[in-house]
Curated annotation (Swiss-Prot):
<dbReference type="GO" id="GO:0030956">
    <property type="term" value="C:glutamyl-tRNA(Gln) amidotransferase complex"/>
</dbReference>
<dbReference type="Pfam" id="PF01425">
    <property type="entry name" value="Amidase"/>
</dbReference>
<feature type="active site" description="Charge relay system">
    <location>
        <position position="152"/>
    </location>
</feature>
<protein>
    <recommendedName>
        <fullName>Glutamyl-tRNA(Gln) amidotransferase subunit A</fullName>
        <ecNumber>6.3.5.7</ecNumber>
    </recommendedName>
</protein>
<feature type="active site" description="Charge relay system">
    <location>
        <position position="77"/>
    </location>
</feature>
<comment type="subunit">
    <text>Heterotrimer of A, B and C subunits.</text>
</comment>
<dbReference type="InterPro" id="IPR036928">
    <property type="entry name" value="AS_sf"/>
</dbReference>
<dbReference type="InterPro" id="IPR000120">
    <property type="entry name" value="Amidase"/>
</dbReference>
<keyword id="KW-0648">Protein biosynthesis</keyword>
<comment type="function">
    <text>Allows the formation of correctly charged Gln-tRNA(Gln) through the transamidation of misacylated Glu-tRNA(Gln) in organisms which lack glutaminyl-tRNA synthetase. The reaction takes place in the presence of glutamine and ATP through an activated gamma-phospho-Glu-tRNA(Gln).</text>
</comment>
<dbReference type="GO" id="GO:0006412">
    <property type="term" value="P:translation"/>
</dbReference>
<dbReference type="InterPro" id="IPR004412">
    <property type="entry name" value="GatA"/>
</dbReference>
<dbReference type="InterPro" id="IPR023631">
    <property type="entry name" value="Amidase_dom"/>
</dbReference>
<dbReference type="InterPro" id="IPR020556">
    <property type="entry name" value="Amidase_CS"/>
</dbReference>
<dbReference type="GO" id="GO:0005524">
    <property type="term" value="F:ATP binding"/>
</dbReference>
<keyword id="KW-0067">ATP-binding</keyword>
<keyword id="KW-0436">Ligase</keyword>
Length: 476
């Protein structure tokens, strides 16, 4: 797909170098031209966005200088709520639902002057690795329309890649920001658990879910993260650790930084072209002054089963609230309360969501809790300890983001296990609670984007972004 324009940076819009209304019109033009094929946006607020952009343009230079996102057009994954706007989680079960509250991360962007364009397609309830599980149709990868954009935040990644937004928000439970960023050739950031409020997020797995940004550049992603990060009294898991200026040391380079390369992430199953691109980038970082050290994260082989036990268990509890009683879809023919619950959930949930609810209910059931859920929590602790030990020796860890470039639409739809393995390099960070990012580092022979994953200590997003900026600079 050919793109007619290159969107301005956040800085260009914020400073008034590019008018807010002009930036918005560029995004809307791309949406009108490409969304019919890509299917990234589920809903748009054209009138509200236009009024907001004109308001920002009418501000004085002094007033605009107080708004770190002044006039920046952005979209949000449709698992984040906005008061009065439809919230679907890409599921039929939330048909017609308009929440009475706005997610904190979204509100912080709006308060900072950003212009909300609309809400973005995703896998249903954020469950998926390809964005083929949406009740509103799959998202297509703007880099190759026969390929998936990744999941579950495929719409958020595709919107940035197709110039439909300067930046977007997604969520990441097991790789749902980083893997789509890799597949679509954009930057995606996973904040530390607790760094960004989850208030207003329609939950999948509450101990794993994070909210984070997509952008064209590391600097733009860093600026968005700086706005949405910070303590929120509305989220009991929100951290009060101070938020630094993420742009302050972006250009410091990697000289003197210790970068760990875990052997377990370069084993069987890694596509040769991904391996070539990532290893080539690591060598460039070494040449730029980084100290590259081999490390081991020995419990990595247990990460996928551990993740799918814990995530599905939490999902089965979180999704119990969708029953047709207070909001969303209600089965019209049910004549008893039990029948209404059963029929509503059968009509409203897609196949992948049902699969995960069943698995989660099973691992929490009497007789299986100790064998599966309790054991998974013990392995989760071992995975976290692997990272704690590694970060005693290194400042950041670099790996492939995904084992392959974007695969073809429909290629893995009938093979859930193969689909789950697409997250093999990303679920560990969610289980350990650490931060990370995916930054483009090359392309395959077919021209498909490849991303490198950078993982950092708890609340050390600044170092992750610093390494990401170095990677980005090396690609130019």
């Amino acid at each position: 797909m050919e793109f007619q324009t290159t969107l301005p940076s956040i800085r260009a819009v914020r400073t008034g170098e590019v008018r807010a209304e002009a930036a918005l019109q560029e995004c809307l033009g791309a949406i009108d031209a490409h969304n019919g094929e890509v299917n990234a946006y589920l809903s748009l607020d054209r009138d509200g966005a236009g009024a907001r952009a004109r308001h920002i343009d009418a501000l004085s230079r002094e007033e605009r200088a107080k708004l770190p996102m002044g006039g920046v057009p952005f979209g949000i994954k449709d698992v984040l709520t906005v008061e009065g706007m439809p919230a679907t989680a890409s599921s039929k079960i939330l048909e017609g639902y308009r929440p009475p509250y706005t997610a904190t991360a979204v509100q912080r962007l709006i308060d900072a002057g950003a212009v909300l364009v609309g809400k973005l397609n995703c896998d249903e309830f954020a469950m998926g690795s390809s964005n083929e599980n949406s009740a509103y149709g799959p998202v297509k990868n703007p880099r190759a329309l026969d390929r998936v954009p990744g999941g579950s935040s495929g719409g958020s990644a595709a919107a940035v890649a197709a110039n439909m937004a300067v930046a977007t928000l997604g969520t990441d439970t097991g790789g749902s920001i980083r893997q789509p960023a890799s597949f679509c050739g954009v930057v995606g950031v996973l904040p530390t658990y607790g760094r960004v409020s989850r208030y207003g997020l329609i939950a999948f797995a509450s101990s794993l879910d994070r909210v984070g940004p997509f952008a064209h550049t590391v600097r733009d992603a860093a600026e968005v993260l700086g706005v949405i990060a910070g303590h929120d009294p509305m989220d009991a898991t929100s951290s009060s650790v101070p938020v630094p200026d993420y742009t302050e040391k972006l250009d410091a380079g990697v000289k003197g930084l210790r970068l760990g390369v875990p052997a377990e992430y370069f084993a069987e199953g890694l596509d040769p072209e991904v391996k070539r691109a990532v290893e080539g980038t690591i060598e460039q970082l070494r040449a730029a002054g980084a100290e590259v050290k081999p490390i081991s994260l020995p419990h990595t082989p247990y990460a996928i089963p551990t993740y799918y036990v814990i995530a599905t268990a939490e999902a089965s509890a979180n999704l119990a609230r969708f029953d047709g009683v207070r909001y969303g879809l209600r089965a019209p023919e049910a004549n008893t309360l039990a029948a209404m619950y059963r029929q509503t959930r059968d009509l409203g949930f897609g196949a992948e969501v049902k699969r995960r609810i069943l698995l989660g209910t099973y691992v929490l059931s009497a007789g299986y809790y100790d064998a599966y859920y309790k054991k998974a929590q013990q392995v989760r602790r071992l995975l976290a300890q692997d990272f704690l030990r590694a970060f005693e020796e290194v400042d950041a860890i670099v790996t492939p983001t995904a084992p392959t470039p974007a695969f073809k639409l429909g290629e893995k739809s009938d093979d859930p296990l193969s689909m789950y393995l697409a997250d093999i390099y990303t679920v560990t960070a969610n289980l350990a609670g650490i931060c990370g990012a995916s930054v483009p580092c090359g392309t395959s022979r077919e021209g498909l984007p490849i991303g490198i994953q950078i993982l950092g200590r708890h609340f050390d997003e600044a170092t992750v972004l610093r390494v990401g900026q170095a990677v980005e600079s090396l690609q130019k």
